[in-house]
Amino acid sequence: MLQNPGADGMRTLEYGKEHEKTLLFLPCTAEPEWAFADSVGLLSQDYHVMQIVYDGHGETGEDFISVETTVDEVTDWLQAHGITRLNAAYGCSLGGACLTRFLALGKIPVERAVIDAGITPYRMPLILRRLACLRDDLGFRLIAKSRKVLETVYPPERWTMPGRDPVKEYDALAAYLKTYSKRTVRNIFWSANNYTLPTKPAERGCQITYWYGEEEKQARHSNVSFVKQ
């Protein structure tokens, strides 16, 4: 694994650099980089995987600013490292929001993209968007503050991979969540739901697949409809 810091605190973890095919990996928030080790390990058997660690995630000394800033940083990093096109890209939740904007801008063409429960911009009055941000912000703070709430919302028996120690993993996760600054938390929830897109998305011929879980079908209906547009 190679680590390359961005100019403003963002880090890019590189795996499988010996491969010609490239894959951009944009993870969700509230998950440490080690949570994706199994997935990235499998992908790196065939791809040069570039896993993004966002500003404000972990003890980077920086705050997360916005989806727009993140996409600019990722684009700049890729171009600075001579990557002018991607064979594949994956984005989950917040990462799906970043990938949606990345694809819409089209500065770096992508052959295939998977948006996994990706967040699309709210289409509701400003006051409702502010209330939604406040709800999400307070919910995150409560989960980060209380181990009991964390395990109630995300039961270890469901979210711990087979063969892993749930106590150790949740100890590490609880410690990780406490590294988020108030500004980072607020910016994540506002920007992920209110980021901007160009009036006319770029036409690059990317094959896009939207993933969602069995229990998310109803909740993700509006996101799927948005991406189809």
Region locations from a protein language model:
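N-terminal cap/lid segment of alpha/beta-hydrolase-fold proteins
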Residues: M1-M10
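Conserved HGGG/HGGXW glycine-rich cap/lid loop of the alpha/beta-hydrolase fold
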Residues: M10-E59
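Active-site signature of alpha/beta-hydrolase-fold catalytic machinery across serine-
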Residues: D38, R101-L105
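Conserved serine/cysteine hydrolase catalytic core
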Residues: R183-F226
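Gly/Ala-rich beta-loop-alpha elbow adjacent to hydrolase catalytic centers
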Residues: G91-L99
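Flexible "cap/lid" loop of the alpha/beta hydrolase fold
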Residues: A104, V110-L142
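Helix-loop "lid/cap" segments that line or gate small-molecule binding pockets
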Residues: R147-P166, Y176, N187-N193, W211-Y212
